[in-house]
């Protein structure tokens, strides 16, 4: 992946930053890939760093993600709710699956999407081809059902929908436009020029 470098010139000196470090300087975190352990650890570290820098100033998280690992996404979610600064969320492009979950987890009144963004919610998936004894598969299935239930509870809390409606609406992939995401309660408004 190409990682651009930007030059910051304050009139007295110049400093080169990779683009993500430059964004971080302005309290911006960019989630631009699928969420896995490495991505989650980086985002969590950035959230904690920005809280330590100024616990009163908002953090802005831009999301363009197809989703990813539930456990890694939940670690980000918990950190967003643990730190003192409000986390504004902005969808650019897509926020699908765990990306949509994190988009909805932003501070109330501070959750946005650009006009042509797409948001997709669905139930959690097992990936990687589950193998093993029937008992082990049953254990994994029960855990997946618990995760599905917990995600529905949290999404209901963040959207104002009932848990039952969330469970119905996430039974299959459910794609929403930015406006539909506002009406659903996933975001608060659409950014337009």
From Swiss-Prot:
Superkingdom to which the source organism belongs: Bacteria
Organism: Fusobacterium nucleatum subsp. nucleatum (strain ATCC 25586 / DSM 15643 / BCRC 10681 / CIP 101130 / JCM 8532 / KCTC 2640 / LMG 13131 / VPI 4355)
InterPro entries with a match to the protein in the record: ClpP, ClpP/crotonase-like_dom_sf, ClpP/TepA, ClpP_His_AS, ClpP_Ser_AS
GO biological process assignments: protein quality control for misfolded or incompletely synthesized proteins
Pfam families assigned: CLP_protease
Annotated EC: 3.4.21.92
Subunit structure: Fourteen ClpP subunits assemble into 2 heptameric rings which stack back to back to give a disk-like structure with a central cavity, resembling the structure of eukaryotic proteasomes.
Subcellular location: Cytoplasm
Residue positions of the active site: 97, 122
Range of residues in the leader sequence: none
Protein role: Cleaves peptides in various proteins in a process that requires ATP hydrolysis. Has a chymotrypsin-like activity. Plays a major role in the degradation of misfolded proteins.
Catalyzed chemical reaction(s): Hydrolysis of proteins to small peptides in the presence of ATP and magnesium. alpha-casein is the usual test substrate. In the absence of ATP, only oligopeptides shorter than five residues are hydrolyzed (such as succinyl-Leu-Tyr-|-NHMec, and Leu-Tyr-Leu-|-Tyr-Trp, in which cleavage of the -Tyr-|-Leu- and -Tyr-|-Trp bonds also occurs)
Entry's family note: Belongs to the peptidase S14 family.
Record key words, sorted: Cytoplasm, Hydrolase, Protease, Serine protease
GO cellular component terms attached to this protein's record: cytoplasm; endopeptidase Clp complex
Molecular functions per Gene Ontology: ATP-dependent peptidase activity; ATPase binding; serine-type endopeptidase activity
Protein's name in the database: ATP-dependent Clp protease proteolytic subunit
């Amino acid at each position: 992946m190409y990682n651009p470098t930007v030059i910051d010139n304050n009139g007295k000196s110049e400093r080169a930053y990779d683009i993500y470090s430059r964004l971080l300087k302005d309290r911006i975190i960019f989630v631009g890939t699928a969420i896995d352990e490495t991505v989650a650890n980086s985002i969590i570290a950035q959230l904690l760093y920005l809280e330590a820098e100024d616990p009163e100033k908002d953090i802005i998280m831009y999301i363009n993600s197809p989703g990813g690992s539930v456990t890694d996404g939940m670690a980000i979610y918990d950190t967003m709710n643990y730190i003192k600064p409000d986390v504004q969320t902005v969808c650019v492009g897509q926020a699908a699956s765990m990306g949509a979950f994190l988009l909805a987890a932003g501070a109330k009144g501070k959750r946005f999407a650009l006009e042509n963004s797409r948001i997709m919610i669905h139930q959690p998936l097992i990936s990687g081809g589950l193998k093993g004894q029937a008992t082990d598969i049953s254990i994994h299935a029960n855990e997946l059902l618990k995760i599905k239930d917990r995600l529905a509870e949290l999404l209901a809390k963040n959207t104002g929908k009932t848990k039952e409606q969330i469970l119905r609406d996430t039974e299959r992939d459910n794609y929403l436009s930015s406006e539909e995401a506002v009406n659903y309660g996933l975001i608060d408004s659409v950014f337009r020029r």
